[in-house]
Amino acid sequence: MNDEMKGKSGKVKVMYVRSDDDSDKRTHNPRTGKGGGRPGKSRADGGRRPARDDKQSQPRDRKWEDSPWRTVSRAPGDETPEKADHGGISGKSFIDPEVLRRQRAEETRVYGENACQALFQSRPEAIVRAWFIQSVTPRFKEALRWMAANRKAYHVVDEAELTKASGTEHHGGVCFLIKKRNGTTVQQWVSQAGAQDCVLALENESNPHNLGGMMRSCAHFGVKGVVVQDAALLESGAAIRTAEGGAEHVQPITGDNIVNVLDDFRQAGYTVVTTSSEQGKPLFKTSLPAKMVLVLGQEYEGLPDAARDPNDLRVKIDGTGNVAGLNISVATGVLLGEWWRQNKA
């Protein structure tokens, strides 16, 4: 039906009132392209939208069951997440957290240009990944070619990114992620030692900068074995950087404890040399044996009773007496230098 009325302006206004019968007879508007009713029954005829329960009661298409968007409800209390299957895509596959922890425990980061150059020349197979800043890459051309040929990942990054990757601002423009070395036993060491062999044994010394300085002195004076409680102490980034390449010329030796280690060396014909500011003989007036184990970190009096032997050689480094003594790293250089002078020079 329709009605019309005249407004004050004289214009005719027409109002259309749609009947319930016409609810399904909406016509298509040829001008706008819109219009046209939805197929189905009108609400007047009892038509209504299907309720949610009705939808759930309808059988689902089989394609829905195979859909990747389908959600699966987990029973209450079943909180164990399913292992994600990413089709073997690298970097996406499930990684066992225990495997990841073990892998990280076996790796360490080495930085410093001299340290990384020496490590590449000595054991390139230990390198897992590398980071460089652009300015050092010309000096690492050989390493870059080797890593590319052996599918080792490397990244050329800026200073901020390298600081983050190495964990220090003292990275020297390069950082390697490497596999740690394992220590050798005393028995393995003495079986291949020569007639002249000096071994450095450290008791309760873990400062990485001291360790780095001592490894540098060892490399300079031909001392190849260093006894430590944990071989990883010689693999820390700070120690290797401080050694300036010297870490690649020494091998960690490990044992149950200092008592057993020294006993094993004594039985193999080595003389144990300790320091003692009270009972020691002046170093530069003492003959040092060709095969010896130099114990540092504790003076003779500070070692466990079971580790001391009356036949051990005790020495001291004479000086002015203006200070209590030398830093352990400096003392190592003096002692090893005298052994080199007497036995190698």
Curated annotation (Swiss-Prot):
The UniProt record lists the keyword Signal: no
GO molecular function terms noted in the UniProt entry: RNA binding; RNA methyltransferase activity
Keyword Protein biosynthesis (UniProt): no
Annotated region described as Disordered, given as residue ranges: 1-98
GO terms of biological process kind: methylation; RNA processing
UniProt biased composition (Basic and acidic residues): 18-27, 42-68, 76-86
EC number of the protein: 2.1.1.-
Gene3D superfamilies reported in the protein's UniProt record: 3.30.1330.30, 3.40.1280.10
EC main group: transferase
Keywords: Methyltransferase, Transferase
One Gene Ontology cellular component: cytosol
Alphabetized InterPro entries for the sequence: Alpha/beta_knot_MTases, Ribosomal_eL30-like_sf, rRNA_MeTrfase_TrmH, SpoU_MeTrfase, SpoU_subst-bd, tRNA_m1G_MTases_N, YfiF_prd
Entry-linked Pfam families: SpoU_methylase, SpoU_sub_bind
Family classification: Belongs to the class IV-like SAM-binding methyltransferase superfamily. RNA methyltransferase TrmH family.
NCBIfam families assigned to the protein according to its UniProt record, in alphabetical order: PRK10864.1
Name assigned to this protein: Uncharacterized tRNA/rRNA methyltransferase YfiF
Organism expressing this protein natively: Escherichia coli (strain K12)
Gene this protein is translated from: yfiF
